């Protein structure tokens, strides 16, 4: 039996729709995409697979002779994207400076709140725990944007027959409806690249995007947050991020 699982934010509903609408074995109509909403309105038939979500014991399923497929990411970029989409789609907003519930802890400063979120992000994307890397067939969600052929190949691995023209169209719609999230991570990655190269230019970042940049820098330089100078205000230039490294 084929079992399917996914990390929150990893386009699980989208991938189930892909299986059921872009293969010869599937018989569902092509789904309608809603901008920035993924396909949470899509109700899978679960005939071609058994869904295990939010928990899936991959090793136990494999011990029973089942094959386990998942939507996830093996790249740091993809994992930042998954976390961003998971937060945005489940709570309707992403953590902000002085959030009264999540990140405002006993009156901590902007920089201290930023570090809490940054370290949390770094620890999460750096660990392989909960990303289902031990699954038999892993779909990397970044391929929806960059490599539809890999999406078709993944369907083929499942023992299904992909309809390539439909897969390509599906990937265009899936990526377009989530482009805002992809662009946010790409913007942060570009800024971090420029900080590393010491290129000076203005930046406009949300609190969460600033935390992403901060955690990317921690990851790149393999340092702890205590090794960086505390930010006292939102950075408006790459120079402000360059300065905290010195």
Regions found by a protein language model. Name each.
Residues 1-56:
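PAPS-dependent sulfotransferase catalytic core
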Residues 29, 52, 98, 232-233:
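Selective for proline/serine-rich intrinsically disordered segments
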Residues 12, 147-151, 238:
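A structural signal for well-ordered alpha-helical scaffolds and beta->alpha junctions
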Residues 41, 92, 97, 231-232:
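Compositionally biased, intrinsically disordered/low-complexity regions enriched for serine, proline
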Residues 21, 32-37, 110, 117, ...:
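Extracellular glycan-modifying ectodomains
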Residues 46-193:
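PAPS-dependent sulfotransferase catalytic domain
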Residues 158-246:
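PAPS-dependent sulfotransferases, especially Golgi type II membrane carbohydrate sulfotransferases
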């Amino acid at each position: 039996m084929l079992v399917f699982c996914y990390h929150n934010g990893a386009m699980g509903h989208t991938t189930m729709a892909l299986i059921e609408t872009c293969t010869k074995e599937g018989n569902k109509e092509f789904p309608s995409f809603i901008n920035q909403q993924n396909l949470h309105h899509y109700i899978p038939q679960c005939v071609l697979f058994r869904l295990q979500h939010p928990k899936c014991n991959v090793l136990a399923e494999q011990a029973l002779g089942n094959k386990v497929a998942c939507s996830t990411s093996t790249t740091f970029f993809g994992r930042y994207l998954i976390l961003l989409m998971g937060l945005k789609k489940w709570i309707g907003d992403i953590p902000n400076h002085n959030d009264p519930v999540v990140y405002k802890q006993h009156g901590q400063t902007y920089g201290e709140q930023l570090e809490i979120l940054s370290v949390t992000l770094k620890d999460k994307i750096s660990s392989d725990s909960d990303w289902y890397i031990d699954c038999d067939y892993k779909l990397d969600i970044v391929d929806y944007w960059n490599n539809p052929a890999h999406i078709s190949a993944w369907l083929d691995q499942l023992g299904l027959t992909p309809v390539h023209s439909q897969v390509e169209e599906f990937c265009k719609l899936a990526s377009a409806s989530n482009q805002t999230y992809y662009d946010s991570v790409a913007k942060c990655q570009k800024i971090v690249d420029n900080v590393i190269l010491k290129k000076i230019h203005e930046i406009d970042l949300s609190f969460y995007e600033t935390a992403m940049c901060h955690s990317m820098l921690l990851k790149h330089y393999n340092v702890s947050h205590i090794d960086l100078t505390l930010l006292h205000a939102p950075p408006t230039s790459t120079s402000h991020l360059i300065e905290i490294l010195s």
